[in-house]
């Protein structure tokens, strides 16, 4: 069953096939990172489970041929918790934003055991980034790849903005994305989180239908489509 919600920037589809709510995000093809503000905006509005507060988060994502998928996210919060200072640290204990991308191989059905990437970053621009099929036995990206992703953060008094690149070679060769171009489809979700009790919160772009906190559920991801 699908219900279309009209929008000036993107179409959203309600899909109850998996007992969840699936939306659609259109990833614009752009020429460079400088064009990211031309892309469609998404907003994290679905907060559930335990939330001490619910910060506003918006973002944009674009496809750069030959480079990869570039994303920009802004969280409107003052003095974000940022105790983690090394890549691979559990930044979800800080105030963190996250991007998950999932890919099915030809003939493979959507499930929670498909290939997906989780890039998680705090306002120190430190990343906890893994890939793999399903939640167990996931692999950290290499230090070299982490540098190539180039996570950066800028801050002001009321917000912080992160940018990150998902390199095309990593997506196409390691993550089963196939050759990416206009018309390519996969799955995505965007998150805001802290697991520290004093500021605990769990926000997502595409709603999640689990009873307990769990972002590792591709069946609830939004459909992503690369467009002109």
Named regions from a protein language model:
Residues 12:
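An acidic-aromatic pocket/loop used at catalytic or ligand-binding sites
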Residues 2-5, 15-228:
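Structural preference for beta-rich elements and adjacent junctions enriched in aromatics
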């Amino acid at each position: 069953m699908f219900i279309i919600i009209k929008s000036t920037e993107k179409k959203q589809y309600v899909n109850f096939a998996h007992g969840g709510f699936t939306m659609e995000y259109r990833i614009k093809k752009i020429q460079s990172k400088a064009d990211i503000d031309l892309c469609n905006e998404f907003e994290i509005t679905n907060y559930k489970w335990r939330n001490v507060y619910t910060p506003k988060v918006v973002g944009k994502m674009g496809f750069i041929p030959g480079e990869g998928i570039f994303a920009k996210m802004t969280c409107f919060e003052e003095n974000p918790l940022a105790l983690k200072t090394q890549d691979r640290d559990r930044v979800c204990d800080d105030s963190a934003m996250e991007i998950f991308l999932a890919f099915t191989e030809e003939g493979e059905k959507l499930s929670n055991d498909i290939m997906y990437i989780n890039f998680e970053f705090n306002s120190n621009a430190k990343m906890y980034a893994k890939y793999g099929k399903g939640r167990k036995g996931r692999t950290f990206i290499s230090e070299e790849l982490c540098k190539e992703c180039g996570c950066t953060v800028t801050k002001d008094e009321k917000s912080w903005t992160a940018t990150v690149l998902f390199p095309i070679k990593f997506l196409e060769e390691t993550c089963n994305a196939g050759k990416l171009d206009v018309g390519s489809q996969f799955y995505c979700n965007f998150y805001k989180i802290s697991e520290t009790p004093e500021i605990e919160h769990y926000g997502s772009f595409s709603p999640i239908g689990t009873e307990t906190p769990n972002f590792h559920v591709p069946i609830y991801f939004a459909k992503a489509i690369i467009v002109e």
